[in-house]
């Protein structure tokens, strides 16, 4: 069971709790992602709650914050399935479709393969952008990091040497405190 079938193409594992008496015999085996016929491991992780749903949880580290943490714990690959405009990319059979259309196509395809058991309403919190009103999709992007403490040393030096000064001077104390505690 899943609330986001269109993300199955980015799944890298299925998690089951080691305390799940009904399913723990599957840990260490593999299962197949339908439609793309890709094998992924079944792993033991307490992120899967034996009392919730089927007790097994698909893990999509590139598109879910909780799954990302599971992926880090198990060294799972990150498979990005989204373009920057939130359409599905070439890692899926539905490249170019928006997520809602891809969801419908995924469900239709699963149904045509005889793999759809049932559809139930499931209340959940969906994040929307404050200004855009659009669903926020977790998306892996490149990020760059600077060594802020190293930059702070030079920034403090120019103030200490009088090459730069604050007006009013009272802000200097706040500046130095901020720079000494920068991370």
For the regions a protein language model found, what residue spans apply to each?
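Short hydrophobic beta-strand that contains or immediately precedes a catalytic carboxylate
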Residues: 1-3
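Catalytic alpha/beta core of large soluble enzyme barrels
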Residues: 5-84, 154
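Residue patterns forming the tRNA-binding/recognition surfaces of aminoacyl-tRNA synthetases
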Residues: 52-183
């Amino acid at each position: 069971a899943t609330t986001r079938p269109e993300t199955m193409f980015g799944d890298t594992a299925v998690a089951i709790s080691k305390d799940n008496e009904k399913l723990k015999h599957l840990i260490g085996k593999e299962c197949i992602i339908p439609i793309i016929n890709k094998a992924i491991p079944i792993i033991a992780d307490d992120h899967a709650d034996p009392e919730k749903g089927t007790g097994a949880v698909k893990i999509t580290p590139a598109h879910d914050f909780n799954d990302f943490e599971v992926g880090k714990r198990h060294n799972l690959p990150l498979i990005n399935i989204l373009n920057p405009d939130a359409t599905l990319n070439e890692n899926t059979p539905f490249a170019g479709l928006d997520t809602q259309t891809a969801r419908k196509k995924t469900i239709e395809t699963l149904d045509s393969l005889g793999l759809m058991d049932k559809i139930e309403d499931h209340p959940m919190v969906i994040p929307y952008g404050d200004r855009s009103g659009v669903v926020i999709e977790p998306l892996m992007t490149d990020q760059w990091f600077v060594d802020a403490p190293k930059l702070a040393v030079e920034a403090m030096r120019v103030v200490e040497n009088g090459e730069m000064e604050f007006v009013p001077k009272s802000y200097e104390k706040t500046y130095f405190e901020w720079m000494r505690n920068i991370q």
